[in-house]
Each structure stands twice: as structure tokens, then as C-alpha cells.
Amino acid sequence: MLTDPDLPQEFERMSSKRPASPYGEADGEVAMVTSRQKVEEEESDGLPAFHLPLHVSFPNKPHSEEFQPVSLLTQETCGHRTPTSQHNTMEVDGNKVMSSFAPHNSSTSPQKAEEGGRQSGESLSSTALGTPERRKGSLADVVDTLKQRKMEELIKNEPEETPSIEKLLSKDWKDKLLAMGSGNFGEIKGTPESLAEKERQLMGMINQLTSLREQLLAAHDEQKKLAASQIEKQRQQMELAKQQQEQIARQQQQLLQQQHKINLLQQQIQVQGQLPPLMIPVFPPDQRTLAAAAQQGFLLPPGFSYKAGCSDPYPVQLIPTTMAAAAAATPGLGPLQLQQLYAAQLAAMQVSPGGKLPGIPQGNLGAAVSPTSIHTDKSTNSPPPKSKDEVAQPLNLSAKPKTSDGKSPTSPTSPHMPALRINSGAGPLKASVPAALASPSARVSTIGYLNDHDAVTKAIQEARQMKEQLRREQQVLDGKVAVVNSLGLNNCRTEKEKTTLESLTQQLAVKQNEEGKFSHAMMDFNLSGDSDGSAGVSESRIYRESRGRGSNEPHIKRPMNAFMVWAKDERRKILQAFPDMHNSNISKILGSRWKAMTNLEKQPYYEEQARLSKQHLEKYPDYKYKPRPKRTCLVDGKKLRIGEYKAIMRNRRQEMRQYFNVGQQAQIPIATAGVVYPGAIAMAGMPSPHLPSEHSSVSSSPEPGMPVIQSTYGVKGEEPHIKEEIQAEDINGEIYDEYDEEEDDPDVDYGSDSENHIAGQAN
């Protein structure tokens, strides 16, 4: 029965129709393919065999026990049936066995499958005829086999590739089934290792997922932080922009306020510029005085420095603005219009800061009155001239705190132009002027006499008396001036000379106190001291009085610096080549040359400077430099050259001689002797707040058109250093920034000595 050639084919067909697991695992299929290959090989060798997928480890299991009755049943049936029936029964039994144990062959190797097939073949061959009770079970097995085939057909129709999750589940199912079917777990190879590997894989996956989750959370947190920081930055930027906008708004508001203030100031300036800067009297004048003063063009602005003119009728050019100049040059303006101008100017002055002090317009007598009617000498003892001097002179508030007062030694018959000296504080002046005007002598004022012929005549007589007195005093002073000149005040080198000079100074001071001409401390002539205005004393002494020097202390010159040492000779050379060159131009030339020089070229002059400084320190150990304030001088609104100024001085002296010789009443102003200074009205910043009504010997010209200019009379009697002190600043009104001109060489003189000698000998 076993040698029937049909059996191998039948078994081959049965084995090829092995039921697969419902999950279609790959291992079972591989095992079946391997068993088929072996069967074919054996058939080719002529050794047919039965290969049933029976596991080796099943004999002790219930399945194997069930298998034995089945095999016995198949043997019995085979014994009682015909070969055909036996063959069919074997086929059914084989299918049953295959279907029963097919799941157990999935995890076994091909060798185990082959062994199982051989054992099954042997068991089948060794089985005898089974009992009838077993047939029902075999029929059930056949039914199961048919069901298995249908399932296989369904599985074959499904896709060969199943999802990876099904593969994993199928492996797990196989492992569990093998573990259940086999009591010996140790015989299952790879089970602990696979579990450990899977556990490791699971742990790795868990770790990866955890790390990925952490990364995602960290990235999410970073994004949140970044978004929060961006929001914060945006908020800060918005706040900053808001602050900037607020600041810009505040700045714009401030700019608008400043612009508004500027506009207001410009409007005020325009209003003031349209009005002529008129001279406002300290006390209210009458309309006739205003009209007379305005018609003559004598309109002096309070903040404008008076600089006398030089034209033939001697018009006083006092108005810096075009409006005022037009008003001065237009005599056709009616008194009412001029009064309105004055009133407007007065209102502007009252509104303006207190630094602008109104001055007193000097009246003009016109053709009806002689020009000598409105000036008195303040050096006389009579009170009325003092009051007239106080009110007859316009105030000059822009001048530097220096005085131009001095004596007129060569004009004993000439009246004196009073130069008001006002302290830098404006309050004391305002307080002193009304006090002076309230006195009985103040009522005899210039403006009060403008249209009063009797008063004018009286003033003329007083002026003549003062001239006579000045003539007598000048004759006495001529000798003293010569002595002072011979001593050489600037170049005293011996103690004897200094002692003589100091004694002479004391004598002059005593003379001054006796005559009572200079009772005001502000006008203390400490070196000259003569009430008649001695020409031999430099007016710079008066200026230095405000710097706190003692009454008997002589002026100590500063030691020359390197530039002064070098410029001394260079200046003389330039003047020799260009006698008419202005000192400002000379200083510019010298300054540019000095800057262009190298240090090696300057070295000798620096050495000379050191030597002079050492010598000066040894001679004057207590010396302290006290700079005097700078000032500029303009004549007719412009700076004059030396030649032009000398020509003007010559004309003044010639006309003065004519007036003295002919005995005319017209008074020509005389400047302080020893000070070649064209400005007759100057402000001196003196410590005393009182008006210098008692000690001004400068002649005052009653005629508004008369140029008030200081001459060079009596310069012969003055010492050389006086010339050098005044030549740079007073003659030309020029102040050098390079050095103090008064420290120049005493021999340098920009004015001609011949003119000074002639002026000194004129009377």
C-alpha cells in the first residue's frame, strides 16, 4: 500500500494544500516550500516518502495522544477497505493531520519539518485498522479540512504583503502558541533574546519619543520666549517712539515759544529802529527845547558812544540809525512831530531795561544866541556852573569806564565841555541827577536858558570870568609841567627821582585841595591835582584811579613781552616807511609776521622778555597788573588815519587861536591836555555814584553842531610815556589784542612833537 505509486503524488498534493495560519505568516510558507523541494528531490532519486508537518516535541502532548487514535483508525480502515477506499481514507486522514498540526510547523526549521514528515509517514504506515467509533472524528476532520482549504483560498486572494503590525502580531501569536503547545520553554530557541531585544527596542522607542517630546516642548518654549521677547521689544520700541515723539513735541513747543519771543524782540527792535534814538532829558523839558534840539539834529542815542564830527560847520553826527539820521538832517520836521518822536522814544526807554539811561539833549541856540551861552566851567567855585554842567551834557552810556576829563591849560578863556562820568550802575545816576537838579543852582540849567536871552548873557559872562581864572592858573602850571616832564615820570630809574616826583605829586594834590576844584573823589588827579587842569599829567592816571591804586602811587608799566620787544623796532620801521598808516593795520601786519616767525627766530626776544620780567620783579616786588578796560574811539562815525586826525587837530588849534586873538564869543571846545582823544563825551566806571559836577575842566560847547574833540595843547609839558599810552588807544581808538600798547617803548610817538610844542606855546 505504501509502494503504490499514486501515494506520493497524493501526499504531495496534500502537503501542497497545507492550511496556513489566518495571518499568513512567512515562516510557515517557507517551511512548506522547503518540504516540497525535498519531496521532489526524493522522488527524483526513486525514494518516495511521506512528509507530514509533525513537530518532534509533540509526543507528550494531548495533540499527539489524539493523533495516535486517528492513525489507528486510518490503519483499520485501510485494512478492511479496498485499495481505493484505503487511499481515500489516507488522503482524508493525511489532510486532517496536516490541518491539525499545520500551525505548529511555522516556527520550525526545514530539517524539523522533514523529520516530522518522516515520522508521520512511519506512524501512518504502522497504524492498523481503527475502531468504528473513530470515524465520526475523521469526518469532522474532513469538514475542518474543507474549511481550511476555503480559508487558504481566501488568504491567497488577499494581498501577499500584510501590514507590519500584522507581522508583529503574527510573530507574537506564533510565540504564544508555541509556548502553550510546548511544556519545555527552554527548547524554544531565541525566545528570551527576542523578548529582550524587543524590550530594548521598545525602550529605545520610548526614549526617542520622550526625547522628541522634550525637544518639541523645548522648541515650543523657545518659540514662546522668542515671541514674548519680540512682543517686549515691540512694546519697548513703542514706548521709546512715544517718548521720542513727546520729546520732539516738547522741543517743537519750546522752539515755537523761542520763535515767538524772537518775533516779539524783532518787533520791538523794529519799533525802536523806526523811532530815532533820541536823547531823553532826565527832567521833562518843554516843547520848545525839544523842537530846537531836534531841528539841529542833536539826537544822541543813549547807547551810542559820542564821537565828534570834523566837518566845517562842525555838525555833530550822533545818530547811528538811518531814521535818526534822516530826522537830524531834515530841519523841516514840525515841533509837534518831533515832540511825538521824543515821547515815543521816552516810552520805549521806560519799557526797556534800566541799563538804558536817558541823556539830556544839549540845546541849540540857533542863530539867535551866541554859541558860548550854554557852557560853564565846573572847576570854578560858583554853584550855578556846576548845575549847568550836570544838566547840559548828554549821557553816553556805551562808552568804556574811562574818563576824558582833563584840564585845558592853553585855553584860559575857553569854556569847558563837561564830560559826565557815570558809574556802571544806572541807579545812582538817576538818584543823583534829580538831587542836583533840585538844588537852587540846578535851576540855572541850559535848557531853561534856551530862549532866555538874559540867562544866556549871564552864562556868557560867567564863562568869561572862568576863562580869565584859567589863564592865570595855567601860567602857574606851565612851570610845574616842565618839571614833571624833566623828571621823566615813565622812566624814573633812581630813588631820588621817584622821591622828587612823589613830593611834587603831593604838592599838586595839596594845591588841588586848597583850590577846591576837584572835590569829588571820582576825579582825583593824584599826579597833577591842579584845579586848572594841568596838561602835564596823563589822563590815564585818572582812568587807573578806578583800578584801586593809591592816590600817590605812580603808574608802574608792565614789562614788555617778546612780541612787544620785537614789535617796538618793527613798528618804528613801518611808521617811517608809511607815516599815515593806521595803527590797526600796523598791528595786523606785525601780528601776521610774528605768527609766521619760527621759534628759533623768536628765541632771542623770549630771552629778552625773561630778562625784563626778572628785572621788573626785582624792582617792583609787589607789582600786580591791573588791566584797564579797553575802549575804541570813532570820529564822525569812522576811524580816522593819523594824518587825517592831525589835520583836524591843526584846524582846531588854528581856529582856537583866531578865537582867542579876535576875542570872539564863539567857544571852541578844548580837549584835555596830554590826551589826544577825539571823543569828548565818555563814560568812566568810577566807584562814586555822584555826578562829577565840580571837577571837569573840559570845555562844553553850547552849539550842538560844534565838534567836541580833545586837542593836544600842552603836550610839550607831558612826559614821553604819556604819549605812548595814549597814542595807540586814544589817537586812533585802536586796541591791540597782541599786547598792551601802553607798555611800548617810551620813545615811540605817533604824533609829531612839533605840533605839541606849538600847541603848548600857543598861549
UniProtKB/Swiss-Prot annotation:
GO terms for molecular function: DNA-binding transcription factor activity; DNA-binding transcription factor activity, RNA polymerase II-specific; RNA polymerase II cis-regulatory region sequence-specific DNA binding; transcription cis-regulatory region binding. GO terms for biological process: asymmetric neuroblast division; cartilage condensation; cartilage development; cell fate commitment; cellular response to transforming growth factor beta stimulus; chondrocyte differentiation; positive regulation of cartilage development; positive regulation of chondrocyte differentiation. The gene is SOX5. Pfam families: HMG_box. Transcription factor involved in chondrocytes differentiation and cartilage formation. Specifically binds the 5'-AACAAT-3' DNA motif present in enhancers and super-enhancers and promotes expression of genes important for chondrogenesis, including cartilage matrix protein-coding genes, such as COL2A1 and AGC1. One of its GO terms (cellular component) is nucleus. Residues 193-274, 448-515 form a coiled coil. It is found in: Nucleus. The lineage of its organism: Eukaryota, Metazoa, Chordata, Craniata, Vertebrata. Gene3D superfamilies: High mobility group box domain. Forms homodimers and heterodimers with SOX6. Residues 77-89, 102-111, 120-129 have a biased composition (Polar residues). It comes from Homo sapiens. The modification Phosphothreonine is found at residues 131, 372. Keywords: Activator, Coiled coil, Differentiation, DNA-binding, Intellectual disability, Nucleus, Phosphoprotein, Transcription, Transcription regulation. Residues 132-141, 716-726 have a biased composition (Basic and acidic residues). It is linked to Lamb-Shaffer syndrome: An autosomal dominant, neurodevelopmental disorder characterized by global developmental delay, intellectual disability, language and motor impairment, and distinct facial features. Additional variable skeletal abnormalities may also be present. Residues 727-752 have a biased composition (Acidic residues). This is Transcription factor SOX-5.
